[in-house]
Curated annotation (Swiss-Prot):
UniProt organism field: Wickerhamomyces anomalus (strain ATCC 58044 / CBS 1984 / NCYC 433 / NRRL Y-366-8)
The family this protein is said to belong to: Belongs to the AB hydrolase superfamily.
Catalytic residues as annotated in Swiss-Prot or TrEMBL: S121 (charge relay system), D145 (charge relay system), H295 (charge relay system)
Protein's name according to its UniProt entry: Probable alcohol acetyltransferase
Transit peptide segment: 1-40
EC number: 2.3.1.-
Subcellular location: Mitochondrion
GO MF term (any one): transferase activity
Segments passing through the bilayer: none
Length: 341
């Protein structure tokens, strides 16, 4: 067990355990396609896209990319905050079974069916488990740089992320009314995380005031200091243990037969030989595209990964839809373009 730290002092910060909730309502943004220049090209609302972020990300992390994907595929894209992220409530547990169930409940609540999933890192594992456990809900998926196996080798990364964020909360004492609060927080994290892209992504959830009507059972947003929207103290062990884990026993006999595109960073440690074997076992209808990147594919290769996704989803749509539902006349099926940087 990790030692519990008290944020600043007990009078300033609430100190309780996270409440236990089997499911939780997820905050979301809906990105609709821009009107197309092709007058008769229909949107595809029956097969919406759900974009699930990585650890300590949010629905706002790749909003611009989601808008591009929505317009390029003529399909609405939902970006959601997973529990303990962004504007979604704080609760335990934080294991993959619970996160996948949250996605299922979101789809039920919004009457979504035959969804197409995009998952990055943490969101990739959530997407894979959602497809395996609820195959009738999911039509296809794009999995960005992760595999359905336990990954103890990445625990060190998680510990560094947590250490840097706790340093901002416990040691830096940055006031919420400081005009330079975000830059000061980034500078404080630099000693633990020299990579500016990683710091930028972690700072997405750092605020000097909470979103409207947002409340947390464990964070006192009125104490005059900046805060992460993540309950960092309570997530310390969960982020290291649960995020790097995978429910091996409950998924050992599960397969998802739908098409799945895997995007792999050539310099990333996340998809090992063991991970490749697990992918072949659980997702037999898989297709891989390698990109010249480490795990930070979405930041290092933004145009490439967006094109891979849109080509993949558009190929499925044109192959499965009758010609007269696409353009009102016969339209040749476009060739898929693989992008590898």
């Amino acid at each position: 067990m990790f030692a519990s730290r008290i944020l600043r002092n007990s009078a300033q910060t609430l100190k309780t355990e996270l409440p236990h909730k089997e499911t939780i309502k997820m905050a979301y943004d809906l990105h609709k396609p821009r009107s197309t220049a092709i007058r008769h090209l229909n949107e595809n609302p029956e097969e919406p896209i759900l974009f699930l972020h990585g650890i300590f990300g949010s629905k706002k992390s790749y909003a611009t990319d989601s808008k591009l994907i929505a317009s390029s595929t003529h399909t609405p894209v939902y970006t959601m905050d997973l529990r303990n992220h962004g504007e979604t409530g704080h609760a335990q547990p934080f294991n993959y079974e619970t996160l996948a169930q949250d996605v299922k409940e979101f789809c039920d609540e919004h009457k979504l069916d035959k969804v197409k999933l995009i998952g990055y890192s943490l969101g990739a594992k959530v997407s894979m488990l959602t497809a395996l456990q609820f195959p009738n809900l999911v039509k296809s998926a794009v999995i960005i740089d992760n595999a359905p196996i336990p990954q103890p080798q990445i625990q060190l990364f998680m510990k560094q992320y947590i250490k840097s964020m706790l340093h901002v909360l416990n040691e830096s004492k940055i006031r919420a009314d400081d005009k330079d609060w975000k830059n000061k927080a980034s500078a404080a994290m630099k000693r633990f995380l020299p990579n500016g892209v990683i710091r930028k992504n972690l700072l997405v959830n750092l605020v000097n005031k909470p979103p409207k009507d947002f409340e947390s059972p464990v964070i006192d947003f009125e104490d005059g200091y900046i805060h992460f929207l993540n309950p960092i103290e309570q997530m310390e062990e969960m982020a290291v243990k649960d995020v790097t884990d995978w429910p091996v026993e409950t998924t050992k006999d599960l397969k998802f037969e739908g098409p799945v595109k895997f995007i792999k960073g050539l310099q990333s440690p996340f998809i090992t030989d063991e991970g490749m074997k697990a992918i072949q076992t659980h997702f037999p209808n898989n297709d891989f595209t390698d990109v010249n990147s480490n795990h930070d594919i979405l930041d290092q290769r933004p145009s490439e990964y967006v094109k891979i996704i849109t080509d993949f989803f558009n190929k499925q749509r044109y192959q499965s839809a009758p010609d007269d539902t696409i353009l009102g006349n016969k339209t040749p099926t476009p060739k898929q373009t693989e992008v590898s940087a």
